[in-house]
Curated annotation (Swiss-Prot):
GO terms for cellular component: cytosol. The lineage of its organism: Bacteria, Pseudomonadati, Pseudomonadota, Gammaproteobacteria, Enterobacterales. This is Glyoxalase ElbB. It is an enzyme of class 4 (lyase). Its EC number is 4.2.1.-. InterPro entries: Class_I_gatase-like (IPR029062), ElbB (IPR026041). Disulfide bonds: none annotated. One of its GO terms (molecular function) is lyase activity. Displays glyoxalase activity, catalyzing the conversion of glyoxal to glycolate. However, this apparent glyoxalase activity may reflect a protein deglycase activity, which could be the primary function of this protein like other DJ-1 superfamily members such as PARK7, YajL, YhbO and HchA. Is not able to use methylglyoxal as substrate. Homodimer. Keywords: Lyase.
């Protein structure tokens, strides 16, 4: 059974992992007969957002503890992830990818990526293992790898221009499709950068998981 690493960034679209994207990813992996192995960085979130009002709250929350809500407690610290034990790696989106896994939300093209995630993704790539990034998560790829990549975040022109500035080749893509960088085994899909509902998000995420598993053969 193939083991697919899934990197989460909290719990909730505005300050962590996009919950629909995370659950759809886990569902697609399970339905494909593979096993999801979940990880999240063991650190404080950049902020905590009230998802009812959209306003910032004064409390603090831990990324790993929050992400454990999505996985029913089946999750490990990102520091424990080992590329040798995984067949592929998938990163759902949500603002947590741009706040907790990187600081793209605040620094844009000058952002940096969580060192544990960067090291893991690089090790996976060096081992010839595929990667899948969705929603805003592909914005981290130009900072993980120092070579040009074909990727998508959908059709948002402003974000696409930032990614091009970072050295990526951005490919416009509808919500129900994927962009595959065949040479580097990297698959991306817009998910909730474009999706208007969970069914639309699922259409592209299912394709991403399916292609990642094919590339893992």
């Amino acid at each position: 059974m193939k083991k697919i690493g899934v990197i989460l960034s909290g719990c909730g679209v505005y300050d962590g992992s996009e919950i629909h994207e995370a659950v759809l990813t886990l569902l697609a992996i399970s339905r494909s007969g593979a096993q999801a192995v979940c990880f999240a960085p063991d650190k404080q979130q950049v902020d905590v957002i009230n998802h009812l009002t959209g306003e910032a709250m004064t409390e603090t929350r831990n990324v790993l503890i929050e992400a454990a809500r999505i996985t029913r407690g089946e999750i490990r610290p990102l520091a424990q992830a080992d590329a040798a034990e995984l067949d592929a790696l998938i990163v759902p989106g949500g603002f947590g990818a741009a706040k907790n896994l990187s600081n793209f939300a605040s620094l844009g093209s000058e952002c940096t990526v969580d060192r544990e995630l960067k090291a893991l993704a690089q090790a996976m790539h060096q081992a010839g293992k595929p990667l899948g990034f969705m929603c805003i998560a592909p914005a981290m790829l130009p900072k993980i790898f120092d070579f040009p990549l074909r990727l998508t975040i959908g059709t948002d022109i402003d974000t696409a221009e930032v990614l091009e500035e970072m050295g990526a080749e951005h490919v416009p893509c509808p919500v129900d499709d994927i962009v595959v960088d065949e040479d580097n085994k990297i698959v991306t899909t817009p998910a909730y950068m474009l999706a208007q509902n969970i069914a639309e998000a699922a259409s592209g995420i299912d394709k991403l998981v399916s292609r990642v598993l094919v590339l893992a053969e």
